[in-house]
Amino acid sequence: MSDQQLDPQALQQEENSLIALRKEKLAAERAKGNAFPNDFRRENYCEDLQKKYADKTKEELAEAAIPVKVAGRIMLNRGSFMVIQDMTGRIQVYVNRKTLSEETLASVKTWDMGDIIAAEGTLARSGKGDLYVEMTNVRLLTKSLRPLPDKHHGLTDTEQRYRQRYVDLIVNEEVRQTFRVRSQVIAHIRSFLMKRDFLEVETPMLQTIPGGAAAKPFETHHNALDMEMFLRIAPELYLKRLVVGGFEKVFEINRNFRNEGVSTRHNPEFTMLEFYQAYADYEDNMDLTEELFRELAQLVLGSTDVPYGDKVFHFGEPFARLSVFDSILKYNPELTADDLNDIDKARAIAKKAGAKVLGFEGLGKLQVMIFEELVEHKLEQPHFITQYPFEVSPLARRNDDNPNVTDRFELFIGGREIANAYSELNDAEDQAERFMAQVADKDAGDDEAMHYDADFVRALEYGMPPTAGEGIGIDRLVMLLTNSPSIRDVILFPHMRPQA
């Protein structure tokens, strides 16, 4: 590769020259009349034709003279033939000088990669065995003014791929497939829950009190009402209000917003599934989650073995179940139960492990900090981590045998949290006390502590049946199923820092 090819300034000058030339070609099309026609109606998709006629020989296609009408973007232009791409795949189109008019042939010579064309003709097969359309008519539908990345330079800069996802989707089939899988996953989750009598609902994105999770919200202002509002961090409290109201099985797939850091696992705007079912507990949700994840793996991969990086996660085997307390001891044999139950020792262990200890944390909070620093990243195969301390679970029901912990689990796969669930707290007085404790933590400096939600307490006072709820991060789940290393790879338009 020459220095000129590597020189960004030279590349930019070359691109500007190509854009100028394409604009001249567009001007010529405008002079002919409508340069952006919208009267063509496609009748066939590229991939459908490839599959339907895969077993037809050259002679059989010639005899059948199957008429087709296709449209797509030019991805390769060799003069005598072009390759076009639509939403399903690609097919060759042949420029037949015997069947196309001189005017059409002259126009074809001016077309560039990236242009969108409509082609009519009959199916044929080349000597090499490739299916193609022998065109009897072809015309330009959209002139592309910017050249696509070529095979030498490509679109390899990761940040540019995220910023210009529209180009990324054009040139990278694996990226298109990732987002097809994402759509399949969401559609299957919806079907899975509806078959089990769950009702899909929508709850507010703008909230006066951000609740349902421990996170920092985005703040905004409602001008007409002159009031501070927040983008929701979770829909939980509204979904549980619906359970109070009699919708005993509900779910929502929608966006949450958290004003926190950006990483390969975190995006400020992300998609979450939350579902709630009355007359169930958190162990029922574990069983349901295992069933759902196995179905999704089978749907996407045709197997319950999920490859991710250099590892393989086994969804076909029962997911491990281990308490927070026991997991710390299992993965850190140098620690003892006495160490974890002594608040001074636990504080020292958390600090040594790298946790941000502020000084007001109770024993349960410190134990969770230790878990996050010393255990979480070691949970490669699917693990349900259970019995979270009640002080970090302000919305979860206390365990009957040990009131210091709750009937809660988080699902970890590949060292990442994928789901969070619990038997819901439906004792209104207990909930009010826990909200007050959260307010005290917030006053002490915990930015992620919850606000007091008086209306939610009032809803519980009307009576909520025993209920289990769960949230599953759609983005992280799709990362696993598509072997994607970054959350930005599975979000169409991830948030990016402004360009300089």
Curated annotation (Swiss-Prot):
| Residues annotated as transmembrane | none
* Disulfide bond sites: none
Q: Which residues bind Mg(2+) 1?
A: E410, E417
Cofactor-binding details, from the entry? Binds 3 Mg(2+) ions per subunit.
One Gene Ontology cellular component: cytosol
Describe, as the record does, how this protein assembles with itself and its partners: Homodimer.
Give the protein's recorded name: Lysine--tRNA ligase
